[in-house]
Protein backbone atom coordinates (compact mmCIF):
# COMPACT_ATOMS: atom_id res chain seq x y z
CA UNK A 1 0.00 0.00 0.00
CA UNK A 2 1.41 3.39 -1.01
CA UNK A 3 1.64 6.15 1.57
CA UNK A 4 0.98 9.80 0.73
CA UNK A 5 1.78 12.63 3.11
CA UNK A 6 -0.11 15.89 2.77
CA UNK A 7 2.01 18.80 4.03
CA UNK A 8 0.13 21.95 5.04
CA UNK A 9 1.73 25.14 6.39
CA UNK A 10 -0.49 27.25 8.65
CA UNK A 11 -0.17 30.59 10.37
CA UNK A 12 -2.96 31.51 12.81
CA UNK A 13 -5.82 30.33 10.59
CA UNK A 14 -6.77 27.16 12.45
CA UNK A 15 -10.44 27.38 11.47
CA UNK A 16 -9.56 27.33 7.76
CA UNK A 17 -7.27 24.39 8.42
CA UNK A 18 -10.08 22.45 10.10
CA UNK A 19 -12.37 23.08 7.12
CA UNK A 20 -9.60 22.08 4.73
CA UNK A 21 -8.95 18.82 6.59
CA UNK A 22 -12.65 17.96 6.49
CA UNK A 23 -12.72 18.72 2.76
CA UNK A 24 -9.59 16.65 2.12
CA UNK A 25 -11.06 13.80 4.18
CA UNK A 26 -14.18 13.78 2.02
CA UNK A 27 -12.12 13.75 -1.17
CA UNK A 28 -9.78 10.91 -0.21
CA UNK A 29 -12.41 8.54 1.15
CA UNK A 30 -12.89 6.77 -2.19
CA UNK A 31 -9.19 6.38 -2.97
CA UNK A 32 -8.36 2.71 -2.46
CA UNK A 33 -5.08 1.04 -1.48
CA UNK A 34 -3.52 4.32 -0.40
CA UNK A 35 -2.70 5.50 3.11
CA UNK A 36 -2.77 9.24 3.94
CA UNK A 37 -0.92 11.06 6.70
CA UNK A 38 -0.92 14.80 7.25
CA UNK A 39 1.85 17.03 8.56
CA UNK A 40 0.80 20.54 9.58
CA UNK A 41 3.69 22.99 9.91
CA UNK A 42 2.75 25.70 12.41
CA UNK A 43 4.57 28.87 11.33
CA UNK A 44 4.91 30.15 14.93
CA UNK A 45 1.25 31.14 15.10
CA UNK A 46 0.36 33.72 17.73
CA UNK A 47 -3.13 32.23 18.05
CA UNK A 48 -3.42 28.99 20.01
CA UNK A 49 -4.74 26.07 18.02
CA UNK A 50 -7.54 24.02 19.40
CA UNK A 51 -7.21 20.27 19.18
CA UNK A 52 -7.40 18.92 15.67
CA UNK A 53 -9.61 15.88 15.34
CA UNK A 54 -8.12 13.29 13.03
CA UNK A 55 -10.64 12.73 10.23
CA UNK A 56 -11.33 9.06 9.63
CA UNK A 57 -9.52 8.72 6.29
CA UNK A 58 -6.16 9.93 7.64
CA UNK A 59 -3.81 7.52 9.38
CA UNK A 60 -2.46 10.42 11.43
CA UNK A 61 -2.18 14.18 11.64
CA UNK A 62 0.93 15.62 13.22
CA UNK A 63 1.62 19.27 14.02
CA UNK A 64 5.25 20.37 13.75
CA UNK A 65 6.01 23.77 15.29
CA UNK A 66 8.50 26.31 13.96
CA UNK A 67 10.24 28.52 16.53
CA UNK A 68 9.67 31.74 14.62
CA UNK A 69 7.45 32.96 11.80
CA UNK A 70 9.35 32.41 8.54
CA UNK A 71 6.65 32.39 5.87
CA UNK A 72 4.98 29.90 3.58
CA UNK A 73 8.01 28.74 1.58
CA UNK A 74 10.15 28.21 4.68
CA UNK A 75 7.31 26.19 6.23
CA UNK A 76 7.28 23.92 3.21
CA UNK A 77 11.08 23.54 3.34
CA UNK A 78 10.96 22.87 7.09
CA UNK A 79 8.23 20.25 6.59
CA UNK A 80 10.09 18.55 3.76
CA UNK A 81 13.27 18.43 5.85
CA UNK A 82 11.28 16.97 8.75
CA UNK A 83 9.79 14.32 6.45
CA UNK A 84 13.11 13.48 4.80
CA UNK A 85 14.36 12.19 8.14
CA UNK A 86 11.42 9.78 8.36
CA UNK A 87 11.50 8.31 4.85
CA UNK A 88 8.45 6.13 5.52
CA UNK A 89 6.27 7.58 2.78
CA UNK A 90 6.07 7.24 -0.98
CA UNK A 91 4.67 10.57 -2.14
CA UNK A 92 4.27 14.12 -0.85
CA UNK A 93 1.43 16.53 -1.61
CA UNK A 94 1.91 20.21 -0.69
CA UNK A 95 -1.24 22.22 0.03
CA UNK A 96 -1.92 25.70 1.39
CA UNK A 97 -3.77 25.89 4.68
CA UNK A 98 -5.96 28.75 3.46
CA UNK A 99 -8.17 26.55 1.28
CA UNK A 100 -6.94 28.02 -2.02
CA UNK A 101 -5.71 24.63 -3.24
CA UNK A 102 -8.52 22.32 -4.26
CA UNK A 103 -8.74 19.01 -2.37
CA UNK A 104 -10.88 17.78 -5.26
CA UNK A 105 -7.66 17.49 -7.28
CA UNK A 106 -5.95 15.11 -4.85
CA UNK A 107 -7.43 12.06 -6.57
CA UNK A 108 -5.98 13.20 -9.92
CA UNK A 109 -2.55 13.73 -8.34
CA UNK A 110 -2.67 10.31 -6.68
CA UNK A 111 -3.80 8.59 -9.88
CA UNK A 112 -0.94 10.16 -11.85
CA UNK A 113 1.63 9.32 -9.16
CA UNK A 114 0.50 5.69 -9.02
CA UNK A 115 0.39 5.38 -12.79
CA UNK A 116 4.06 6.32 -13.17
CA UNK A 117 5.90 6.17 -9.82
CA UNK A 118 9.17 7.32 -11.39
CA UNK A 119 8.00 10.86 -12.10
CA UNK A 120 7.10 13.91 -10.06
CA UNK A 121 3.53 15.10 -10.42
CA UNK A 122 2.92 18.83 -10.09
CA UNK A 123 -0.17 20.98 -10.23
CA UNK A 124 -0.53 24.64 -11.03
CA UNK A 125 -3.15 26.92 -9.59
CA UNK A 126 -4.92 28.45 -12.58
CA UNK A 127 -6.78 31.21 -10.79
CA UNK A 128 -6.15 32.95 -7.49
CA UNK A 129 -8.97 34.55 -5.57
CA UNK A 130 -6.99 37.62 -4.50
CA UNK A 131 -7.89 40.97 -5.97
CA UNK A 132 -5.79 43.16 -8.29
CA UNK A 133 -4.14 45.10 -5.43
CA UNK A 134 -2.88 41.89 -3.82
CA UNK A 135 -1.62 40.62 -7.16
CA UNK A 136 0.26 43.87 -7.83
CA UNK A 137 1.84 43.90 -4.37
CA UNK A 138 2.72 40.21 -4.71
CA UNK A 139 4.53 40.88 -7.99
CA UNK A 140 6.46 43.72 -6.35
CA UNK A 141 7.32 41.40 -3.45
CA UNK A 142 8.58 38.72 -5.86
CA UNK A 143 10.68 41.29 -7.74
CA UNK A 144 12.23 42.66 -4.54
CA UNK A 145 12.89 39.18 -3.21
CA UNK A 146 14.57 38.15 -6.46
CA UNK A 147 16.59 41.39 -6.43
CA UNK A 148 17.82 40.60 -2.90
CA UNK A 149 18.78 37.05 -3.89
CA UNK A 150 20.72 38.24 -6.94
CA UNK A 151 22.49 41.13 -5.15
Residue ranges and their predicted role:
Residues 3-5, 37:
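Cell-envelope/extracellular polymer assembly enzymes that use nucleotide-activated donors
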Residues 7-9, 40, 65:
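Short hydrophobic beta-strand elements that form part
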Residues 13-17, 45, 102:
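Donor nucleotide-sugar binding loop of glycosyltransferases
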Residues 13-29:
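Short, well-formed alpha-helical segments that are part of the catalytic scaffolds
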Residues 32-45:
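Short beta-strand/loop segment that forms part of the nucleotide-sugar
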Residues 42-51, 99-100:
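A conserved acidic beta->alpha catalytic loop
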Residues 66-68, 72-82, 100-151:
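Acceptor/aglycone-binding surface of glycosyltransferases and processive sugar-polymer synthases
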Residues 88-100:
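Short beta-strand-to-loop acidic/aromatic patch adjacent to the donor-nucleotide binding site
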Amino acid sequence: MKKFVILIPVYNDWESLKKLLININENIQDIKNVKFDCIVVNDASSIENSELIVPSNFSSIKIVNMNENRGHARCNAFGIKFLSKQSNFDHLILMDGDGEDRPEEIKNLVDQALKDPGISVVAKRIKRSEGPLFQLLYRIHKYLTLFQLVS
